[in-house]
């Protein structure tokens, strides 16, 4: 069960819905990153519901290593394990795997690397990634792709694109096999293919054209937001977008700042994820409608205003900047929890405002009014 419905369009920006076995996602949407099946900062799944999270994103590699995907399967899959009723997306593990692997350990069959926990040698290829994600029983599984370092030579990027295409074919075949097994927890698991090609426009376009032929449930643009200038990222999105199936959701992986999201939406992207809101919060950097504030600055010690006077989140309704700064400085867990809750609310509310603007036909105006204020670095 997977159906993307385009409700409205303003320029290339899309307002739609994406139906899954675990509920309907209103797009554009931000997926909240729960690497080890939990948000870093002490938020529960109930908290996520209250702050408007639609999709939780979990990490295949980390859950494979600890507690183990077999254990999660025995517990009924990620939804029962975490008591999260809404959609879950699992990444393929590729990004972590390739950061741990040496170049000469990357073969056609897959990748050999060592666990960051105990040093144990692990092999992962397309079939293994699909098997792990099937055990996790996520709503959406990401295809296993090669995450090439940026910059990469043109020739290597071309070889990598071709290999990632072959791996996607294997991922699709393995998922079809797994979804047909009688003991598979989620027989309606969806598969998203991933576009690669570094910052080479022709490789990106060729690769997108080829993976689109495989009729996946959705498509992602990967390998960006890894140090390249923002202008390169925007150029690649614009180059690839015309070749992305219009009837499938589009996901920009690992992005990004509020400004990046606004630019991505304007170029036709539906889904985003990033560790930035939770990571920044844990270091006292909090998002507001007027930009980021750094609670580490001494000027906030006696500040009795909420983090953002324009925000209606549970944190801003009750607590002051001065109090949250004190908690963070004292190392109190509550400080991290409140900061993370605010930042994730900010991101989820940003997406709700974007959807409302698209509904009203006023997205261009919304973007122009807010993009200058937001951190667009």
Pin down the residues of each PLM region.
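Non-catalytic, usually N-terminal nucleic-acid engagement modules in DNA/RNA processing proteins
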Residues: 1-185, 298-301
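C-terminal extensions of enzymes
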Residues: 1-17, 25-34, 41-42, 145-151, ...
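Conserved, mostly hydrophobic/aromatic
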Residues: 23, 56, 91, 133, ...
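Hydrophobic alpha-helical packing residues
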Residues: 23, 164-171, 211, 240, ...
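A non-catalytic, amphipathic alpha-helix used as a structural packing/dimerization or gating element
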Residues: 128, 132, 159-170, 206, ...
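Generic secondary-structure signature for well-ordered alpha-helical cores
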Residues: 138, 169, 173-176, 242-245, ...
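Glycine- and acidic
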Residues: 150-153, 158, 218-224, 333-336
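Glycine-rich phosphate/ribose-binding loops and adjacent secondary-structure elements
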Residues: 162-165, 174, 178-180, 186-307
């Amino acid at each position: 069960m997977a159906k993307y419905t385009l409700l409205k369009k303003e320029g290339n920006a899309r307002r739609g819905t994406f139906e899954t076995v675990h509920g309907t996602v209103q797009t554009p949407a931000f997926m909240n990153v729960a690497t080890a099946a939990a948000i870093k900062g002490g938020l529960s799944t109930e908290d996520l519901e209250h702050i408007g999270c639609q999709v939780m994103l979990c990490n295949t590699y980390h859950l494979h290593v600890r507690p183990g995907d077999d254990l999660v399967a025995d517990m009924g899959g990620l939804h029962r394990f975490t008591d999260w009723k809404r959609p879950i997306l699992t990444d393929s593990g590729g990004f972590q795997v390739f950061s741990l692997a040496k170049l000469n350990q990357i073969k056609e069959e897959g990748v050999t690397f060592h666990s960051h926990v105990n040093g144990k040698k692990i092999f992962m290829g397309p079939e293994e990634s699909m098997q792990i994600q099937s055990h996790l029983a996520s709503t959406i599984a990401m295809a296993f792709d090669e995450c090439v370092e940026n910059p990469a030579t043109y020739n290597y990027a071309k070889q990598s694109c071709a290999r990632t295409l072959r791996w996607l074919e294997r991922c699709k075949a393995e998922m079809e096999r797994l979804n047909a097994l009688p003991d598979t927890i989620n027989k309606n698991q969806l598969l998203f293919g991933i576009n690669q090609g570094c910052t080479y426009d022709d490789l990106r376009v060729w690769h997108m054209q080829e993976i689109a032929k495989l009729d996946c449930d959705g498509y992602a643009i990967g390998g960006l937001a890894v140090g390249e200038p923002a202008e390169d990222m925007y150029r690649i999105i614009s180059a690839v977008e015309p070749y992305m199936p219009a009837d499938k959701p589009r996901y920009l992986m690992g992005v990004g700042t509020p400004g990046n999201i606004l630019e991505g939406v304007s170029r036709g992207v539906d889904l985003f994820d990033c560790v930035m809101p939770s990571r920044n919060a844990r270091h006292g950097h909090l998002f507001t409608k007027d930009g980021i504030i750094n609670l580490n600055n001494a000027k906030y010690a006696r500040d009795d205003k909420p983090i953002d006077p324009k925000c209606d989140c549970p944190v801003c309704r009750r607590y002051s900047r001065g109090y949250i700064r004190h908690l963070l400085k004292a190392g109190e867990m509550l400080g991290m929890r409140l900061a993370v809750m605010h930042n994730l609310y900010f991101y989820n509310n940003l997406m709700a405002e974007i959807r409302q603007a698209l509904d009203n036909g006023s997205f261009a105006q919304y973007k122009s009014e807010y993009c200058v204020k937001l951190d667009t670095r």
